[in-house]
């Protein structure tokens, strides 16, 4: 007797699409079969011939919640957005209050997240100036990876590291057998350009974009790649916004370096042409780039040069964003993404023929799980894996309506954009957590996930 049968699936993996039924027992995929006519289960879900894919593993999430008085996110609310958006495992970034840069802070965050999240989760530790001895402790406590900032830091809370500090962190990550993710931009060049642009009266989104040009992003990427080559750790360069940066990482990868490229839906679905319409709600770092670069990014994604996609979900109160219409420097930096990442990729990627479903599963499910050592528990649907799955409706036709978001804040750079394709059912460990936009589980349903096998993730 099984707990659940999901029948009439067109099951998607990076290897292809097969017609099958999925049998679930004790939260795991117990069998995948072409014929379950004689099989009994407590519940049967008919996928009706729709595509069924693994739940998304979002490796880049900033809920920024460790205090109910904070203004940025809520574990329980933002994880509802994740559930509706098809994200079954979030990997939460260490930039919180307090930052996740010590063992004590890591354990407290694990406790609070476990009590309140509605989807499964893993945690980063932070690599900041002065906390090198804490990295091993957080690794041993279950951190799946670590983050350092080369720029765009939060001074006094999550400071950017010098090259020497970053190299020492890379060495420690290599010794632990973990993974380091970096925000790669050049802090001093950004500061110099901002000073010049502000002195000239620049206050709009074009001024912001000009203060963080492609060349400084790529200089930082090159620096990180050089340090990684010497230290030998696994490195993921986050939110790469431009195709030349992607090429730099791919070249290092082809030469045997354990380096990987993450981009995000914001860089694939928005360009500088949208600045006048979206304004400060598209203020992210690095900035979005030109339409020409956007075309090349899509080609690189389909051709395998981009390894993963992360939402970089991070909310600000609307009152932190609105001043940016008149003065971009007064706007908070970040955008919501949990509820929109998969639908936007289905809409502008899969349904426009720019991205196969198989490749989407690779970059949003399988590869993130592998890189962070949580595969095959997560990121795939095979016997023994957690029964985390999505039923997709590629014909659904609607628009992004940020006013209906489940997260703490109700805005989006994608607000009003058409959507064709979205998950209509989200399952985590055999339990339906969201269906047709309704969240069906309580706080604390989400479970903590940690690394399984580093070697298996290569």
Swiss-Prot record:
- Species in which this protein is naturally found: Paenarthrobacter aurescens (Arthrobacter aurescens)
Keyword Magnesium found: no
User: What are the alphabetically sorted keywords of the record?
Assistant: Hydrolase, Metal-binding, Zinc
What this protein needs as a cofactor is:
Zn(2+)
> Subunit details for this protein?
Homotetramer.
Q: What is this protein called?
A: L-hydantoinase
What InterPro entries does its record include?
Answer: Allantoinase (IPR017593), Amidohydro-rel (IPR006680), DHOase/Allantoinase_Hydrolase (IPR050138), Metal-dep_hydrolase_composite (IPR011059), Metal_Hydrolase (IPR032466)
Protein function: Rather more predominant for the cleavage of aryl- than for alkyl-hydantoin derivatives. The stereoselectivity of this enzyme depends on the substrate used for bioconversion: strictly L-selective for the cleavage of D,L-5-indolylmethylhydantoin, but D-selective for the hydrolysis of D,L-methylthioethylhydantoin.
* Residues annotated as binding Zn(2+) 1: 60, 62, 147, 312
Family listed? Belongs to the metallo-dependent hydrolases superfamily. Hydantoinase/dihydropyrimidinase family.
- What NCBIfam families would the database entry show? allantoinase (TIGR03178)
